[in-house]
């Protein structure tokens, strides 16, 4: 990780600028109460997890943008976001593909067959939500997330 000081294996910081260009800035601009950024070197995410969980303590819901975190947590809802130019999934996304509840894409031609080593059986029956690059949301996606969170509260 180029942005992580060499003497650290992980670092948790809180974003405060909703007008910035990073993902955490966009979360704030979209209305998030707060946005945290956990950076961890390969293999250090498990060490970083206690600090992240402590930082999230008391929060009813949290959005965690990470496939790798799925090795440690079972989310109430898991969305796999496929960007415009992604022709191949990252290894961490492929590893937890079966645990995705739905897919979100800006590409109307989303074709899982273009993803090497991806089983179509893993994807069958899972909803795909098309969003615009300006909005990254739509009413059906919002309703899906609400329904998943409600179902998780019942369990």
Predicted regions and their residues:
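N-terminal phosphate/diphosphate-binding loop that engages ATP/GTP or pyrophosphate donors
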Residues: 1-40
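Short secondary-structure boundary/capping elements
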Residues: 16-19, 44, 61, 88
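Conserved active-site and cofactor/substrate-binding residues in soluble primary-metabolism enzymes
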Residues: 22, 44-47, 136
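Conserved catalytic-core segment of NTP-binding enzymes
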Residues: 51-61, 66-149
């Amino acid at each position: 990780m180029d942005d992580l000081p060499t003497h650290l294996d992980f670092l948790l910081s809180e974003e405060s600028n909703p007008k910035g260009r990073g993902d955490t800035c966009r979360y704030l601009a979209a209305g998030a109460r707060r946005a945290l950024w956990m950076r961890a070197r390969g293999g250090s995410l498990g060490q970083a997890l206690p600090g992240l969980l402590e930082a999230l303590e008391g929060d009813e819901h949290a959005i965690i943008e990470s496939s790798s975190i799925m090795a440690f947590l079972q989310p109430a809802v898991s969305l796999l976001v496929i960007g415009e130019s992604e022709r191949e999934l990252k290894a961490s996304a492929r590893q937890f593909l079966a645990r995705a509840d739905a897919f979100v894409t800006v590409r109307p031609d989303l074709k899982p067959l273009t993803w090497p080593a991806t089983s179509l059986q893993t994807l069958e029956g899972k909803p795909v939500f098309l969003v615009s690059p300006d909005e990254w949301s739509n009413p059906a996606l919002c309703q899906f997330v609400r329904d998943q969170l409600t179902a998780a509260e019942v369990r």
